[in-house]
Amino acid sequence: LQENYITHNPVSLIRQKSRYLQKIQQARVTRKLNDRQWSILIDEIESRCAKEPLYERHLFIFSAFYLLGCRISELADTQDRQPVMSDFYQDSNHLWWFRTVGKGNKAREIAVPDAMLKSLKRYRRYIGAPGLPSPRDHCPIIPKQKGDGGIGTRQLRKIVQVGFDCAIERLAAQGQHDEAMAMRHATVHWLRHTAISKDVQHRPREHVRDDAGHQSVQVTDRYIEIDLQARHASARTKTLNTDNKETI
């Protein structure tokens, strides 16, 4: 029998391929908006609200994604659930929460910040509803402009894309073409990533985990990014002595 011999080490080839895949993954677009993109987005929508009240709905939707860290299925009507205004509720300590059902049909409550309450009041004025929701307010959170019920995921994606397009247009007009080009890849889910990435910079991880509906803190940790300059600055003062005195 004639034997065939392998001329290359297969384990070595697998390792080389693995390193190559890692480089490809690292080069992928970061799936969140940076501070500049987000600032332009909100500023542009707010400025349009003054001219066209229709953009009040856009402003509320982006506020909810950013301040609550919601998934699209937690704001839009689906076959399984229809979010209503009374999902915003006040507990016995006068704290406001947003009740929702997320991934894996898991119910949770999201802490509602003051900025979200302000946005909710503003939006309710726009749709002709008084003050903050009552426990008996079963109106859709984002009602259709025509017909009954709330908007679905398809319509919600379209509204978000309009907001993205507004920001892209403004970035391009300001000559920030790289920022505009990067934002063309944005999807609705980027808003959740943007929200959580910002949240972990200021809040305890456990709090972010529970609000985001993550199964573990390890999932939340994926959103933590360390600024390289801050990282280097914190390392510069390390010494060999426990009393931090320089010996070399």
Model-predicted segments: where are they?
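Conserved tyrosine-mediated DNA breakage-rejoining catalytic core shared by Y-recombinases
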Residues: 77-122, 128
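Active-site/catalytic core of tyrosine-dependent DNA strand-transfer enzymes
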Residues: 113-182
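Short, basic (Lys/Arg/His-rich) helix/loop patches that form interaction surfaces
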Residues: 50, 157-210
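Flexible interdomain linker/hinge and immediately adjacent N-terminus
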Residues: 5-43, 145-149
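N-terminal DNA-binding recognition helix of tyrosine site-specific recombinases/integrases
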Residues: 1-14, 70-73, 166-170
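C-terminal secondary-structure termini that scaffold catalytic or DNA-interacting sites
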Residues: 237-248
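Basic, Lys/Arg- and aromatic-enriched nucleic-acid-binding interface segment
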Residues: 39-72
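Catalytic-site neighborhood detector that most strongly recognizes the C-terminal catalytic loop/helix
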Residues: 212-237
